[in-house]
Amino acid sequence: TVKFYKNNSLVNTSSYGNLTSEFDDEHIAFMSILFGTNTCVWNFGQDSTFAGQISAGGNADENGIGDFKYAPPSGHLALCSANLPEPTIGSNSATQADDHFNTVLYTGSGSTQSITGVGFQSDWSWFKRRDATVNHALYDSIRGGTNALRSNTNGAPAQFGDAVITFQSDGFQIAGTNVSGINGSSDSMVAWNWKASGSSVTNNDGSIASTVSANTTAGFSIVKATSPSSGTWTVGHGLGATPDFIIQKYLASNSRWTVWQNTLTSGQYLGLNESNAVASSGTPFNFTFNSTVIGGNSNYDGTSTDVIYYVFKEIDGYSKFANFTGNGNADGTFVYTGFRPSWVLIKNTARSADWRLHDVARQPTNDDGGHILLPNSTSSEVTSEYDIDFLSNGFKLRSGDVYENGDGELLIYAAFAEDPFKYANAK
């Protein structure tokens, strides 16, 4: 319902059901038609004099915010970020975004060293050397820190030289001397880190048991199970809510990574180690996703093998898993997330296109070249041509590149926050 007042008197009420089909997308636009040198001044609570045109009213909303000519009706608030709901994860909350996700940059030493500054004990850490063509390396607390998964290959977990990762209270230790690509001397490195629960439990919610480490506050869990040799099955994920984004890897060799996201249609998925467009054949999932379980399909892999899932549930002000349509030019699409992003992963679903990964640790300011890494490739960091702006409430593409802004093409993304919109400024 929309109510229109003139000089504090109600003149019209319109309910959504009475509006014409022109408003079916639930947007209402207000317009002023001006002629000649006429001007129009709007007050959304910033100035009850309307830029000195009338005497001040001095009325605030019920939260004590704003300066209105007349007192706003009960339940109606000034249109400003201060009146946004208090996020569960945010500056004035018990927990902050970087208590659950954080990026660290470091320089390899060629010998055992501890990396601090993560801010928590990570349960999933994803490493990439920035200055060389080297495999990605992914470790988690359930599988342990010896054998890395590589997002750019379909191979089984394998050790990086003699490197062993130990998760610590403020980061991780990398032990070993044959550690090129993860801690080689002078290697320029990035590590993206997520916190689960810090420990794991057996979960029997599915048709087969799973080992789960779940952080319900941040909507993230790690799930490991052993798949049957045939048929479909389910495993519990521990989040207590239906997931929005799932990364899956059968741990046997020659088993591709598969990614499902809530905006894909039933039966669709993507390959994290591939550049392929969205697929719907092969059914790596059985597409049973609910508040307790996710589904697998052994017919996809054909063997009884261990499988790992990284499972995410969207949390307002902290994480977002959605899609957008590209516009193909340097004044690119703006994507609203509800927070200032610290990490953004993008994939064009319409064509063969690399995954693109941006973060603010490698790109601390806007108009700085993009600094992309490709999860499906060993490529080193690209620091030009693919710019992105990190804004207070989302991100904006600054390139016409078809991989992440193809004109009229559908792209999915995953994003994690630096600060919620309520407390954020643009870069």
Language-model regions, residue ranges each:
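Surface-exposed molecular-recognition determinants
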Residues: 1-427
